[in-house]
Curated annotation (Swiss-Prot):
Binding site for Mg(2+): E261
Cofactor(s) needed by this chain: Mg(2+)
Originating organism: Ehrlichia ruminantium (strain Gardel)
Coiled-coil boundaries: none
Sample GO molecular function, one term: magnesium ion binding
Cofactor remark from the record: Binds 2 magnesium ions per tetramer.
The protein's name in its UniProt record: Phenylalanine--tRNA ligase alpha subunit
Enzyme Commission code: 6.1.1.20
Length: 344
């Protein structure tokens, strides 16, 4: 096994040093350190080695190789990035004899515009805006939301954890703004209804054309007596018709989330036969209500979560999520909005 690991180390090192583009380097990183990457698989399999000494030996070697390759990727990324900047500077030489162009007014980023639009729609339904910390403890992100200890979302390959503990608890970059809902219910003091939306940044360990390690989400929560699935469907239908237009076709599909029961995913029809998932929702699980000292025999409610980048891409026909964060002024000029859209 150690021979295979050392061969893998040499192979990865050669590939990293020989690559000449950031895109190739990212593909190599994913191949070795992604969810199903070679190094990731070895790390997972260490616990299956029965011999204690062999497990320690293999564990030390794999962890050392893990650190070395991570460091090598980071240093090579810095080098390639500098080369890219140098090449760009050579291409972007400015003719100083040209006359000065009039100053342009900047545009509102499409994410900011859509966030404002979504807030306006839900505020018109009587929801209130709430905010919460992006650094959270595991209770508010996972435990209170009925997410068990072995759930895949809690793995370090999917979630960003801090190395240091706070009050002997692990701290995580929140994976959803549901943590704001938990804090809102905790601090409710028996005042109903609870009708809130929680927009904000969330973090997950993923990076490709449709996923980003940081993205924006808005979650909604409505708790009161006698709230049912009909209230949820009305709310979602109202939002989607306002956001995408009155002719949008909508369907609800059965799904599973640990924090809602029943749960549903909502799709809209894009072409003649194509349905695209828009959001997840459901009736708040009784365990979640119990965890925040709300009696599920008296109160019920619904919750939903919407990915802002996702609905922005669909509404404005943007194919690559990564373009939102490249600071490309030409792209922003094309997809951005005039500052008069900045209202709520």
């Amino acid at each position: 096994m150690l021979d295979n690991i050392h061969n893998l180390h040499k192979e990865a090192t050669d590939k990293i040093l020989s690559t000449s583009s950031l895109e190739e380097l990212e593909n190599i990183r994913s191949a070795y350190f992604g969810k199903s990457g070679f190094i990731t698989v070895y790390l997972r399999n260490i616990s299956t080695i029965k011999n204690l000494e062999e497990r320690k030996s293999v564990g030390n070697v794999v962890n050392t190789i893990y650190s070395e390759l991570k460091s090598l990727i980071n240093s090579h990324r810095t080098k390639l990035h500098q080369i890219q900047i140098d090449n760009q500077l050579l291409q972007d030489k400015v003719d100083i004899s040209l006359p000065i162009r009039p100053q342009k007014i900047g545009k509102l980023h499409p994410i900011s515009n859509v966030l404002n639009e979504v807030k306006r729609i839900f505020l018109s339904l009587g929801f209130k805006l709430y905010d919460g910390p992006e650094l959270e403890d595991e209770f508010h992100v996972f435990d209170a939301l009925n997410t068990n200890k072995n759930h895949p979302a809690r793995e370090e390959n999917d979630t960003f954890y801090l190395k240091t503990l706070v009050n002997n608890k692990r701290v995580v970059l929140r994976t959803h703004t549901s943590s704001v809902q938990i804090r809102t219910m905790e601090n409710n003091d028996g005042i109903y209804p609870i009708k809130v939306i929680a927009p904000g940044k969330v973090y997950r360990n993923d990076w490709d054309a449709t996923h980003s390690p940081m993205f924006h989400q808005i979650e909604g929560l409505y708790i009161d007596k006698n709230i049912n699935m009909g209230h949820l469907k009305y709310c979602i239908n109202y939002f989607l018709n306002k956001f995408f237009g009155k002719n949008v076709q909508i369907r609800f599909r059965n799904s599973y989330f640990p924090f809602t029961e029943p749960s549903a995913e909502v799709d809209i029809k894009c072409n003649q036969n194509d349905w695209i998932e828009i959001l997840g929702c459901g009736m708040v699980h009784s365990n979640v209500l119990t965890n925040v000292n709300i009696d599920p025999n008296q109160y019920s409610g619904f919750a939903f979560g919407i990915g802002i980048e996702r609905i922005t891409m669909l509404k404005y026909n943007i194919s690559d999520l990564r373009k939102f964060y490249t600071n490309n002024l030409q792209w922003l000029d094309h997809y951005g909005f005039h500052f008069t859209h900045l209202t709520i």
